[in-house]
């Protein structure tokens, strides 16, 4: 890979302190406990990085933090492209967009409740703090593994500006710039932008002259810092991300078990690689260990409707957000209000099967809005610091999965291999999953740090959270009607396009499929599923630390937290798959 070539063009007076990796870590100021402290003064396991350190390491997205943070891993699901964050082995494996993470993500003090919202470019960063272990007292739910705080550079009193341009492999062009300065006696502003584009993809098709993986993304942020009075200020933060990049394709590697999908028409020649003349050899579209070798489906035309779908793995995602942070210094007490709103819209296609054939692909459409409000009072002196606060959040998600499957998977292969008759007679080609999820959460919290001697300090924290999450949805018959054909053949229903096809398979339900078949009313076993999870949890933290000297802090912590429960928002066949998932406590 070519080394990234960077040139820094200075516009005006540039006053940006550079912190090298060799400098001692105590020079980094963090806000892990909602107030500024030296990283060596905090009784929390923290990896803190300055913006310059991150820039030197090619920091581009939030997921890149895993490359230089011990214990942090980030994997992207092939099914939906949702990032999965794990710290010290505490994570989750759920490709549903609606699933809650075990790692909290905060951007300039505002929580991002779903990891799919974190995939935009990172730029003009002041620092990033990775907190390890449950952070339930100050940050609340969904921080059982830890917390990551992303902090942007703030507007400056003096004018400064900068522009960085870079060229890299695959024709990648990376441009980042900012301008900052005074807007009068009582206001300061900052505008920053970054765009990354590449001229070619890094994945190469194993069956045709095609490539995948081009980047085309842009992000900007405008910040306005206004002094409302001598002791009151407001920081406005408007941000926008547009991502038109291509997703990666799965790689089918040498040794992959060839499934039934390849055995039947129209892929009958593949049988030669199982029991024919080429038995035991690797099909030509399977990689032999090359990381950039892959295959994918570019389009699919429905035989039933004649409609052609663009299935090339790619994104059309936008995030728009606005936050306002108000601080009122009342002398010994500081009142802080943080209000945040984010709107995330997504149309994204992914290929699951790793081959050129269309055995498993999907298009995700997401409409997600989030709102949060935090109010907190804080104060203290050299010996005692305290925080009291309340928090409220509300988010709503509408998700639409359109799944595509081939006749080789559910049709002809079934006939060739004597699978269940309905699949051979009525293959399923497309299906839709649609759902709505609404989540409301409220919390009260307190935090006290008491230095009872020159070296010893005791920290106590507690938070009570009440959450309600409602999920309503179903797997519906798509426009091609093939799912209805299967259900009507298998169960004697009278389904049509747009009808719910999720089976009530709960034996305790009065409308379960077996009871309805006996009663001669099978249609009654199919209806939209809806349920609500209500969670009330008390979380706490106790830390005792001992300061050996300015460079060494010994501490011990006992803390707990919880990850919100949820629902299987992805494709489901029966209502038992949609039963609520209980909260996870750690």
Predicted feature locations:
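Acidic, small-polar-rich N-terminal luminal/periplasmic segments of exported/outer-membrane proteins
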Residues: 23-158
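Hydrophobic, lipid-facing positions within transmembrane beta-strands of outer-membrane proteins
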Residues: 26, 83, 146, 159, ...
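Outer-membrane beta-barrel translocator/receptor signature
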Residues: 83, 100-102, 114, 123-132, ...
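Periplasmic-side early beta-strands and strand-to-turn transitions of outer-membrane beta-barrels
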Residues: 149, 157-158, 166, 178-277, ...
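Transmembrane beta-strands of outer-membrane beta-barrel pores
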Residues: 165-169, 195-199, 240-244, 330, ...
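Solvent-exposed loop segments that connect transmembrane elements
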Residues: 202-211, 248-308, 353-361, 402-434, ...
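Structural signature of Gram-negative outer-membrane beta-barrels, strongest in the C-terminal barrel
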Residues: 225-229, 377-378, 389-393, 437-586
């Amino acid at each position: 890979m070519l080394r990234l070539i960077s040139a820094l063009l200075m516009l005006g007076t540039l006053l940006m302190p550079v912190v090298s990796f060799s400098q001692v870590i105590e020079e980094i100021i963090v806000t892990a406990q909602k107030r500024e402290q030296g990283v060596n003064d905090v009784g929390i396991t923290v990896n803190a990085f300055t913006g310059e350190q991150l820039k030197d390491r090619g920091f581009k997205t939030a997921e890149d933090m895993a490359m230089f943070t011990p214990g942090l891993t980030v994997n992207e699901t092939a099914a939906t492209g949702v990032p999965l964050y794990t710290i010290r082995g505490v994570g989750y494996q759920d490709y549903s967009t609606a699933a809650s993470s075990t790692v909290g993500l905060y951007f300039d003090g505002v929580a991002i409740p779903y990891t799919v919202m974190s995939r935009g470019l990172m730029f003009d960063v002041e620092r990033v703090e990775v907190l390890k272990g449950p952070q339930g007292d100050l940050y609340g739910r969904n921080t059982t593994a830890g917390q990551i705080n992303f902090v942007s550079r703030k507007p400056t009193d003096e004018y400064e500006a900068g522009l960085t341009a870079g060229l890299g492999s695959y024709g990648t062009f990376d441009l980042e710039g900012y301008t900052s300065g005074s807007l009068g006696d009582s206001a300061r502003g900052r505008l920053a932008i970054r765009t990354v584009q590449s001229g070619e993809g890094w994945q190469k098709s194993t069956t045709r002259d095609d490539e995948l993986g081009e980047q085309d993304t842009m992000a900007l942020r405008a910040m306005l810092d206004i002094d409302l009075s001598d002791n009151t200020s407001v920081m406005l933060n408007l941000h926008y991300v547009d991502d038109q990049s291509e997703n990666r394709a799965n790689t089918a590697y040498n040794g992959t078990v060839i499934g039934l999908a390849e055995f039947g028409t129209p892929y009958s020649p593949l049988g030669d690689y199982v029991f024919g003349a080429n038995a035991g050899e690797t099909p030509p579209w399977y990689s032999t260990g090359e990381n950039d070798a892959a295959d994918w489906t570019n389009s699919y035309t429905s035989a039933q409707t004649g409609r052609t779908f663009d299935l090339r793995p790619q994104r059309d995602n936008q995030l728009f957000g606005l936050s306002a942070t108000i601080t009122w210094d009342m002398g010994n007490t500081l009142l802080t209000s943080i209000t945040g709103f984010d709107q995330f819209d997504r149309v994204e296609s992914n290929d699951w099967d790793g081959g050129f054939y269309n055995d498993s692909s999907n298009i995700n459409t997401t409409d997600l809005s989030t709102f949060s409000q935090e109010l907190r009072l804080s104060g203290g002196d050299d010996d005692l610091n305290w925080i009291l606060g309340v928090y409220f959040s509300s988010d709503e998600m509408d998700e639409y999965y359109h799944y595509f499957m081939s006749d080789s998977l559910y049709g002809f292969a079934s006939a060739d291999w004597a699978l269940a008759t309905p699949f051979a007679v009525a293959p399923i080609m497309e299906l839709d999953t649609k759902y709505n999820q609404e989540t409301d959460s409220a919390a009260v919290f307190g935090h006290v740090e008491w230095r009872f001697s020159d070296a010893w300090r005791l920290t106590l924290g507690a938070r009570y959270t009440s959450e309600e999450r409602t999920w309503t949805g179903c797997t519906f018959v798509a426009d091609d009607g093939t799912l209805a054909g299967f259900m009507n053949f298998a169960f004697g229903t009278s389904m049509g396009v747009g009808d719910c096809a999720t089976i009530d398979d709960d034996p305790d339900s009065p409308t379960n499929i077996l009871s309805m078949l006996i009663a001669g009313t099978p249609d009654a076993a199919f209806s939209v599923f809806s349920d609500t999870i209500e969670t009330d949890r008390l979380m706490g933290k106790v830390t005792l630390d001992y300061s050996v000297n300015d460079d060494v802090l010994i501490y011990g912590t006992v803390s707990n937290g919880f990850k919100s429960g949820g629902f299987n928002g992805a494709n489901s066949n029966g209502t038992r798959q949609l039963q609520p998932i209980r909260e996870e406590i750690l």
